[in-house]
Amino acid sequence: MSPENLSDCNNSVKDFDQHPELTIRQCVHREKPYKQEECDDSACDQHLRVHKGGMPYECKDCGKAFKYRSVLYQHRIIHTAARPYKCKECGKAFKRSRNLAQHQVTHKREKPHKCEECGRAFSALSVLTQHRITHTGEKPFKCKECGRAFKYNSTLTQHEVIHTEAKPYRCQECGKAFKRSHTLSQHQVIHKGEKPHKCDECGRAFSKHSSLTQHQVIHTGEKPYQCRECGKAFRYQSTLTRHHIVHTGAKPYKCPECDKAFNNSSTLSRHQIIHTGEKPYKCQECGRAFYCSSFLIQHMKIHFEEMPYRCRECGKPFRLSSQLIRHQRIHTGEEPYICRECGKTFKYQSNLTRHQILHTGAKPYKCPECGKAFNNSSTLTRHQIIHTGEKPYKCQECSKAFYCSSYLIQHMKIHFEEIPYRCKECGKPFKCSSQLIRHQRIHSGEKPYICKECGKAFNCTSYLTKHQRIHTGEKPYVCQECGKAFNCSSYLSKHQRIHIGDRLYKCKECGKAYYFSSQLNRHQRIHTGEKPYVCQECGKAFNCSSYLTKHQRIHIVEKPYVCKECSKAFSCSSYLTKHQRIHAGDRLYKCTECGKAYCFSSQLNRHQRIHTRERPYRCKECGKAFITSSCLKRHQETHTLQTPNSV
């Protein structure tokens, strides 16, 4: 059909629009007229689609075609500046009534559309539909030029401009050209210095709406991008993509100097500075140089950024109100993030996320050398250095080397960062006031954190949290090897070395080896006879601080640890733990020589000396050696006892 005929057809429809009283309509392309008892637009619309392939109504401005005239009328508003639909709450105007309806939900805070996967709610169905794609990973929109797939049609449309050379949108200020008008608009904000997109939560302003959207996730705590391997969730798609490399084990970025490989380019770049000693990031204000851009950014805040939010407790200033709120939890002890499994509370979302892995038992990070698995990547990285002995992170100031980048960063603060907070009692310096406040409690004896069950006080919230587990019986830290549970993560870490068999710390006197340096230090006092911990009440001395703590309860007759089985009370939690094994009948520690089993490791250690003939406790008077310290003490009394004949 020729364009002229189509034009005639359109004119015939137009004529009928102006004369609705007509009941018979005739198309110039049909031999017979068609009759309609009630003259309405739908018959004309239906008929006209025969000629135009289903899309008879074309926009004169952009050429886009539509099925219905009503949709064309709605579309034409895009080309005009008219925004007839105005919000009564905030005055914001919209081109379409449905956009106004969607916007008004934000004032009512209604979110009727809920995601079945993660439970997140949305104010608009279209936003929920877009969100669902984050769970499925579906990318239905494919570029015909390069085959790249996208989640959203709008993203594909933006991408397709890459394949054309045209950049019709040029900046009048600097001459830079852009492929899209909105990219030019975003760019022009740089010249104006405008930041029109403001966060309602903290007042921070941004030049781009996308930057504001990214920022707002900080306040909501939302993490919509979840890893299918380990369940870990992320705020941004890019962070999830980087995380996936952890599971594949791919390390495509290799250092040409030492052949060390990395799973991302930024880590390689930071590593290479170790070899060059270069500090490319220089402060324009004071000339100070840094080897890492993040250090420079942190430093620049001293010169430029306002810090309007100040803590009333310690005076520490912050750039954002959200940072101040997080900081204030140190003083208030508030822990708003609750674990649904065990009820444990946390100050920060990140701490809760790490904790929840304990309940799932997931250990997705496996060492390729020995097969040991870990529940987070940083622990695996630290573990792998045991095999290599490598200390790749070297301080450029004093040449001290570290096997972990976080230790180097912490160390670098000694050289570069100011430490303005100093203890008046002992002179120890601190980087932030909260650390100084905690430290000063050692001198003052202040213990502001009190247990509601037994009244015991602590100078630190973490100590109170550990203590409270004695009353609740909670043991959230479970050994994956033998199923033994602990109420403290450090106890689990110590226990796990039993399975690994690593006894790195050896006594030079008797050859006995230990898992920890602290254990070796305590043991060596047996040989030296040193007892630095003295009771102020009776003057009795001990070679270990925990023994002194236990002893001091004799004077105050405090027994806060009660057995739930028989109500027997103990002055020390370890005594209660040992006692409870009597009820449980657990004999976990078995002798490999004769098969005899014991409730406690100390009993097994004493027993094994029968087989090894080891006698580590030696009398300084006569040189006689004994299997246990109690035997040595009894023997030493023979030297101190004086008979009447010897006087």
Curated annotation (Swiss-Prot):
This protein's record includes keyword Zinc: yes
Zinc finger (C2H2-type): 57-79, 85-107, 113-135, 141-163, 169-191, 197-219, 225-247, 253-275, 281-303, 309-331, 337-359, 365-387, 393-415, 421-443, 449-471, 477-499, 505-527, 533-555, 561-583, 589-611, 617-639
Compartments, record wording: Nucleus
GO molecular function: DNA binding; zinc ion binding
GO CC terms of this entry: nucleus
Pfam families (alphabetical): zf-C2H2, zf-H2C2_2
InterPro entries cross-referenced by the UniProt entry: Znf_C2H2-type, Znf_C2H2_sf, Znf_C2H2_type
Chief localization: nucleus
Domain of life where this protein originates: Eukaryota
PROSITE patterns the record matches: ZINC_FINGER_C2H2_1, ZINC_FINGER_C2H2_2
Protein keywords: DNA-binding, Metal-binding, Nucleus, Repeat, Zinc, Zinc-finger
Protein name: Zinc finger protein 11
Lineage: Eukaryota, Metazoa, Chordata, Craniata, Vertebrata
